[in-house]
Curated annotation (Swiss-Prot):
It holds the Pfam family Toxin_12. Residues 22-48 form a propeptide. It is found in: Secreted. GO terms for molecular function: ion channel inhibitor activity; sodium channel regulator activity; toxin activity. The keyword Transmembrane helix does not apply. Belongs to the neurotoxin 10 (Hwtx-1) family. 15 (Hntx-3) subfamily. This is Hainantoxin-III 4. The presence of a 'disulfide through disulfide knot' structurally defines this protein as a knottin. The keyword Cell wall biogenesis/degradation does not apply. It comes from Cyriopagopus hainanus (Chinese bird spider).
Amino acid sequence: MKASMYLALAGLVLLFVVGYASESEEKEFPRELLSKIFAVDDFKGKERGCKGFGDSCTPGKNECCPNYACSSKHKWCKVYLGK
């Protein structure tokens, strides 16, 4: 019983700390997280010759950036997992 009380208290403290940390973070956190996950800088706004994740493309034209492939079903660039 005593251990479960300490565990519940620790959980509440952890929830408070995570909530406070997320409030204090900059608003750019979701964009930074996505750019790190997909290893591209889609949100920087700079011009490039290839299309990034989620951009529309034409299958077979090789318009997508490296590590991406044009989906023939959806017609947008997606992560290429290889075969």
